[in-house]
């Protein structure tokens, strides 16, 4: 569809699958992550964790989640969010803190290392391990990994079990954990690549 305007011509893609959302009232800040679960859109932002459903005019803040929320992740039977105050579990529009690590969860990955299925969470400082409770089938905090404490924004785990962690401001770390996942067995800091190559965020 072509439209003639006072200052030119505009093309409108009528059947485009892309929608643009412009909030009318809520100032939700910068969006870091998003998940859609049971008809609710969850937005992890630097102002808190917001929810938006079909019947809502604009996103609303989930109570108790003010401040920085780095990620929200669907790990099968749980929605988990990394928040300034700790690791949150979401049910509908209710957030409760998972006992264990304190504050600053920046990224979460479900992975298998040394034959163990775990959740790994990076944060402002420690690397945390979550294991599945065999009774409730829910993820729970297990322990912090010894030997690594850094400000990590994102990470990935490769098929051989190497953890590649991107620092908030400088370089990348390659980590290997010991068999019981309780300490770092190997650590390599990669500050720069060979001349002509550039580092990028993981």
Q: Model-found features: residue ranges?
A:
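Carboxylate-rich, polar loop motifs that coordinate divalent cations or form catalytic acidic clusters
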Residues: 1-202
